């Protein structure tokens, strides 16, 4: 093998374990893995998949969490909150995530890797009972909190 050939092979991900950065960019949490016992581990994997790249700024990830915090407060304070109201709030959050994804590629990568939009869509599943809708929405809120925590733990930007 000639000198140039070996160089181009490495660029294609051959030898030396391939291009791990591309593997991280392609990592996406599967919805079935986000459970009440595994959501913290999944959040850590998402943030690790963004290591070595520009993470979101702390301000950006906190603004995303602020959207979710309002829902979290409602869910914890109001036992009579209807499934329909929860679904409406999740739809609004989903729309705001889509908007932020359109504005900034780093947000789009984060939302995609964390599978946030599909998670929010799953709350709107017509087959769920009122109790299941509330439980799934609470799990979403906890998952978002875990993402923010690991973002900080792994050195999220303060810019």
Which stretches of residues belong to each language-model region?
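Small/polar/charged residue-enriched interaction surfaces, especially the RNA/DNA-contacting tracks
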Residues: 1-159
């Amino acid at each position: 093998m000639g000198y140039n050939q070996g160089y181009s092979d490495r660029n294609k991900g051959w030898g030396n374990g391939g291009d791990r950065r591309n593997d991280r960019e392609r990592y996406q949490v599967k919805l079935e893995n986000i459970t009440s016992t595994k959501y913290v581990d999944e959040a850590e994997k998402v943030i690790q998949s963004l290591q070595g790249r520009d993470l979101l700024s702390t301000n950006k990830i906190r603004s995303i969490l602020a959207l979710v915090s309002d829902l979290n407060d409602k869910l914890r304070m109001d036992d009579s909150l209807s499934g329909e109201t929860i679904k409406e709030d999740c739809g609004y959050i989903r729309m705001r995530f889509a908007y932020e994804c359109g504005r900034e590629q780093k947000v789009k990568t984060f939302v995609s890797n964390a599978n946030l939009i599909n998670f929010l869509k799953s709350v709107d599943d017509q087959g769920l009972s009122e109790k299941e809708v509330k439980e799934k929405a609470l799990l979403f809120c906890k998952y978002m909190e875990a993402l923010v925590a690991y973002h900080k733990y792994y050195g999220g930007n303060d810019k």
